[in-house]
Curated annotation (Swiss-Prot):
It is found in: Membrane. It comes from the Eukaryota. The chain crosses the membrane at residues 35-55, 66-86, 117-137, 146-166, 185-205, 208-228, 260-280, 289-309, 331-351, 370-390, 402-422, 433-453. GO terms for cellular component: membrane. It is a multi-pass membrane protein. GO terms for molecular function: antiporter activity; xenobiotic transmembrane transporter activity. The lineage of its organism: Eukaryota, Viridiplantae, Streptophyta, Embryophyta, Tracheophyta. It holds the Pfam family MatE. This is Protein DETOXIFICATION 3. Keywords: Membrane, Transmembrane, Transmembrane helix, Transport. One of its GO terms (biological process) is xenobiotic detoxification by transmembrane export across the plasma membrane. The gene is DTX3. Belongs to the multi antimicrobial extrusion (MATE) (TC 2.A.66.1) family.
Amino acid sequence: MEEPFLLQDEHLVPCKDTWKSGQVTVELKKVSSLAAPMAAVTIAQYLLPVISVMVAGHNGELQLSGVALATSFTNVSGFSILFGLAGALETLCGQAYGAKQYEKIGTYTYSATASNIPICVLISVLWIYIEKLLISLGQDPDISRVAGSYALWLIPALFAHAFFIPLTRFLLAQGLVLPLLYCTLTTLLFHIPVCWAFVYAFGLGSNGAAMAISVSFWFYVVILSCYVRYSSSCDKTRVFVSSDFVSCIKQFFHFGVPSAAMVCLEWWLFELLILCSGLLPNPKLETSVLSICLTTASLHYVIPGGVAAAVSTRVSNKLGAGIPQVARVSVLAGLCLWLVESAFFSTLLFTCRNIIGYAFSNSKEVVDYVANLTPLLCLSFILDGFTAVLNGVARGSGWQHIGALNNVVAYYLVGAPVGVYLAFNRELNGKGLWCGVVVGSAVQAIILAFVTASINWKEQAEKARKRMVSSENRLA
């Protein structure tokens, strides 16, 4: 086992000197080379279920409603948890790679996969009873039946997520983003004809769309596994050390639970937003408009999400390597990219505010309402990009617990109450609800900015070093 690097920087360079030295420019190139492919990977992964929803929706309004309801429920109750838990691997695998503890990267990945499987079993039990659960919550029985059947056929896809999500973090920690991109694009191209065949050629309707998702994600698992198994790039890192297995599982949950809380609390807030919109006057209009805003914000988020993944990787690698100065510069580089992308996309959205609604609806009322909410949506673009980058810093550094507490305070103690008050008491309706989202994001951004500015980078690097050299892999 190779010994991790000792701390290599006696003193951190002041920010002013960092800018003058050109370190930020160098790091910008490195962060960008990771961020662009990761954004494309995220888009491709996002499109897989979207394509199935689109194909299934052409079978009728009932099918579309049922599939949309099932997609929302399964995202909240299952997929969000697995994606959240994977944040632990950004800390552990990234720091292990920086510390040249290559065999730990594979062991962490195997441990995460093994930990995900029993979680998927529990989630599957819930999904089996989705139809009855939705009916008990007052949903239309026909829509609930379609949603329940669709969710049932998504269970294999859930188990596929237990494998491919750790594999993607395994590759990301090593900076192997281009192979990851090629595998993801191959899966997307595979999914399109498979989805069409299951829905139309085999006549399986909405169930066929769910089956296609499951088949495609397992195809994704197979090609990712083949790359990891046979690529020379993974010779050192695919090793499994059985003696570290139990301690790696403990570390995975130590960082994974707060990481999952970070993700789930944010995902759940937006589902709560849609539910609240159904209680407003003219619920069809309010729900439609807020769904359009949410979809637009989600599509934009893949860009700062890619930057966040890149920053997380660079921060974790450099902390593990004992080079805190470069870790700090990575944060500055990520924020530079955020400034550029948020300025561009918020300006583009505002310029297109009067036509963006037509991409989703032909109703003039809906289009005008979306245009009215666009300034708030632009603010969301700016704040979401900022918080995404700083959440990436949190995952790379290993302080997910702070991020989770921050989300509770920002969204549930501030944002949600403000949104409900403005929507119902001040009668701002959907605009009021989205104001609550913006306020919550602003509070989240302020707290994250304060925490990030207060980071003792040498101390974080020392924690990463101790985590890697600990003979028993005890929790840091």
